[in-house]
Amino acid sequence: MKIIQTLCIAVLACAHWAQQSSYQSLDYNNVACSLDDEGAFFSQLQAGLAGYEIPKNSGLKTIFAGSYWIGAQDVNGNLYMSAAKYSAGGNWSAFHGGPIADASAYGTMAYANAYGDAIWKISKQEILTHQANFQSPGYLVPTAIASWPGNGQANLGIAPILAPFIDLNHNGLYEPALGDYPDIRGDEAVYIIMNDNSYQPDGNQLGIELHAMFYQYSTGNYLNNTTFLNLRAINRSNKEYYNYRQALFLDFDLGNYSDDHVGCDPSNRLLYAYNGDDIDESDGGQIGYGANPPCQGVLCLSHPLESAGRLTGSMDAGMNTSFDTTAWLLMNGQNSDSSYWMNPLTNTATQFLYDGNPNLPNTWSEVSSNNSPGDRRGMLCISEALFPQNSTVCSDYAFVYDRSGDRLQNVQQVINISGALLNSYQSGGNYPCLSTAFNDLTDETLLPNQLVVHPNPSHGKIHLTWNNIQAEHLEIRTMHGTLIYAESIENMSATDIDISELPRGIYFIQIGTHMQRVILD
């Protein structure tokens, strides 16, 4: 059924609509995921294939497809929605590649040439190489850096600043030939610009420009199985919105799509899927994980959840392209008939479906409810009370995975990982929307021959050695830049530090202009 449905999408999309998706693969760590600029992620819908593979090159997938849902009301209570469950381009998508522009600009060659492929892939190593060589005679700026969409075209009605970049001379212009470079997170990132206004607008869209940065780290711990998402929604409309809702829809397929369960953990802002039995068989052309199948989750690092849970019954009916009212109700914890979700154990209304831990029999889960496993879809939603014109809602997510034990042990470990990531995120205080957070890159950072951290990853006790560095102090900062430790190191070339009391996560050790990343496991 899964394959037949997606093939139907592919046929319809290819047959009717000119605007199609452009794809990139993010595969720097143990995850290989497909991304596009038409409102979908982790999917290859036009080929009818799942798009989130872990382990990489194994053929095993945990997510079939994902998409963005956005809704809000104006001052009179009128609803505006941009949402589609399966985005395959054209009418099958709520978002389309490129930034908001003047209405007359979308059909021009200038817009098509600039944003026909509104998706860009870049690595930290490419940036470091560019920093070291941009002043060298004969150096050619690589395409990944030269094509970075730092500035918009004013003559097309596009905002002057688009994707974040480091502006060395502070003139507001992205000039890679003069040393400017993309401002990314992670070891590798894919940046996507989309809007809900350019393709056959019906008056019900919000006028939102969506900027998504997916990024990964290659490490020796759980981050090697994690993909991060920084999402910026920019209100380019002439309206002030109220009761803003933003959701991620996910069609989970843990190998075999027909034997899964879904749950959520509001305290850790987490939605997750796990196998409904102990063996994940291959079925329907999809490879199963076999014994001890994994748990796959997604958590919101930046916002508490408004609602989360499995889509069931009429909430999950069909694959229609317009289901604005149903999507809005779901994002507000309601059924398609406007009734509120109910927790059967407490007989009270709830915003969170199956919010119990399946390892605990007295909590509300699909296990304790004796639900038959099956094909599972879910969503998690965040909210903002007010979304003014020209303002930005910035949110951060992490897609986490574990297969270290049996199917229910893996659920607990995903919950543990989510808690560790959330603690690490929150320990950094406020997180600026445009901050790279995890890596402030300069041409003198991350030089292993001059500053060495061992062991790395570490359980807490680390040994530092350095040479040819003139500095009086050693500093340790969180991934958000907050200073948490400082030590005088004058006339020293080595020291031992115990950071075992800190939350698990990523930290940066800096001596002078030299920096090393350390992972506390």
What are these language model-derived features?
Residues 1-23, 438-441, 508, 515:
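Bacterial Sec-dependent N-terminal signal peptides
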Residues 2, 13-17, 41-43, 470, ...:
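Intrinsic low-complexity/disordered segments
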Residues 4-7, 270, 277, 441, ...:
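Residue-level detector of intrinsically disordered/flexible regions characterized by low predicted structural confidence
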Residues 5-8, 231, 390, 519:
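Intrinsic structural disorder/low-complexity segments
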Residues 6, 444-521:
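C-terminal outer-membrane/trafficking sorting elements
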Residues 19-434:
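A long-range scaffold signal marking pre-active-site subdomains of enzyme folds
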Residues 174, 441, 472:
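Short clusters of hydrophobic/aromatic residues that line enzyme substrate/ligand-binding pockets
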Residues 430-446:
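Low-complexity, Pro/Thr/Ser/Gly/Ala-rich linker/spacer regions in secreted
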